[in-house]
């Protein structure tokens, strides 16, 4: 079974744990093969997940599913570079994206407000420059702004 098939089965399963784990993976993927395979199923996934309580404490886990669906629809519509979605999902760690080759590190410094580290990065696909600030409030998250 392919990775895309396994993710699709999880997302259609009705099992909150499987949906959550797979939605988190889809929400951050840049893999064209996964996106090509899953994007046509976005509406089906949304229908299958309707009414499934995904839980969450400070942040509803539904945010991961919504971000995954948004990513699939954006890809399907060929709306542009996937980096445009980074500000809409708090869990894009610029260090991971640099490791994956999706972003290039331009510089690192302190955040303008003194809270957190600021990474200046550029998308390796489209060249868009981003200012990404490490944030934390019960869990780490990242604030992405066009530079």
What name fits each language-model region?
Residues 1-2, 15-21:
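Generic helix N-cap/helix-start motif at coil->alpha-helix transitions
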Residues 14-16, 46-50, 58:
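Short inter-helical turns and helix N-cap capping residues of alpha-solenoid HEAT/ARM repeat scaffolds
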Residues 15-16, 30-35, 74-77:
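Alpha-helix initiation and capping sites
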Residues 20-31, 52-71:
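Structural detector for internal amphipathic alpha-helices that build alpha-solenoid repeat scaffolds
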Residues 79-118, 132-135, 141-142:
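Short recognition patches in nucleic-acid-associated and regulatory proteins
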């Amino acid at each position: 079974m392919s990775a895309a098939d396994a993710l699709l089965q999880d997302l259609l399963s009705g099992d909150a744990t499987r949906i959550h784990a797979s939605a988190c993976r889809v929400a951050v993927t840049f893999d064209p093969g996964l996106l090509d395979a899953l994007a046509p199923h976005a509406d089906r996934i949304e229908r299958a997940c309707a009414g499934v309580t995904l839980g969450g404490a400070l942040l509803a886990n539904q945010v991961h599913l919504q971000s995954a669906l948004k990513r699939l629809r954006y890809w399907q519509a060929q709306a542009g570079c996937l980096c445009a979605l980074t500000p809409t999902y708090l869990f894009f760690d610029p260090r991971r994206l640099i490791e994956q080759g999706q972003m290039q590190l331009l510089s690192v410094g302190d955040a303008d407000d003194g809270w957190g580290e600021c990474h200046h990065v550029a998308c390796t696909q489209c060249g868009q420059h981003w200012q990404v600030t490490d944030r934390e409030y019960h869990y780490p998250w990242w604030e992405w702004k066009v530079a």
